[in-house]
Regions:
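Conserved pre-ATP/AMP-binding loop-to-beta segment of ANL
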Residues: 8-27, 34, 57-63, 173
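Conserved S/T- and glycine-rich ATP-binding loop of Class I adenylate-forming
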Residues: 22, 28-31, 64, 70, ...
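Structural detector for helix-capping/boundary residues
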Residues: 2-3, 20, 42-43, 68, ...
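GHKL-family ATP-binding catalytic core of two-component histidine kinases
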Residues: 18, 39-41, 116, 149
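Conserved AMP-binding/adenylation subdomain of ANL enzymes
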Residues: 46-63, 73-112, 125-127
């Protein structure tokens, strides 16, 4: 087998880390001025993923579609770390593609996604729709990073049959601080 682990030089030792050690530096969007660097610890990143997993009742059978950049807390903590914490999986796309979004949801058997309001608007004004199986499989979509207009949310849910959960978070908190509840049965 050509697994990466088997090919790793055994003389290379991993560094000991603790939950309070710095894990990464991520910048805010700069909504209150100049973007600020936020240092996250390993535990803060795990907490950000955990709060998402709990709020959305993520299970090992869930698979997220990540179309957001991983240098954004929504992409990293919500659609990568949260699925891993819950035992699920995540499909990471190089970038958002309006023409491929629903096809990717179908192809990879996606059960949920997290996007920003602009993407919801692009999908709503796009030509493509999910097929019936994909609609049934999608438990919810998640909108964050900016306010989502009620009429846009309602139009999206009516057209695609996918409930949208609006959440609010901060780079500083490693994910959401508020989340609307899941629809009943989700």
């Amino acid at each position: 087998s050509n697994s990466l682990i088997e090919e790793t030089d055994p003389s290379i030792k991993l560094h000991d880390i603790s939950p309070s050690d710095h894990a990464l530096l991520m910048y805010t969007s700069g909504t209150t001025g100049v973007p600020k660097g936020v240092i996250h610890t390993h535990s803060s990143l795990l907490a950000g993923g955990w709060t998402t997993a709990v709020a959305h009742n993520l299970q090992s059978s869930d698979r997220a579609l990540c179309v957001l950049p991983l240098y954004h807390i929504n992409g990293l903590c919500v659609t990568v770390i949260a699925p891993l914490i819950s035992g699920g999986s995540s499909v990471i796309c190089p970038k958002f593609s309006n023409s491929n979004f629903w096809t990717d949801c179908e192809k990879f058997k996606i059960t949920w996604f997290s996007v920003v309001p602009t993407i919801i608007s692009h999908l709503l004004h796009g030509k493509n729709d999910p097929n019936k199986i994909t609609k049934k499989r999608l438990r919810f979509g998640r909108s964050a990073s900016a306010p989502l207009a009620i009429d846009t949310q309602s139009s999206f849910e009516k057209r695609f049959g996918v409930p949208i959960i609006e959440t609010m978070g901060l780079t500083e908190t490693a994910a959401q601080i508020l989340s609307n509840p899941l629809p009943p049965g989700q």
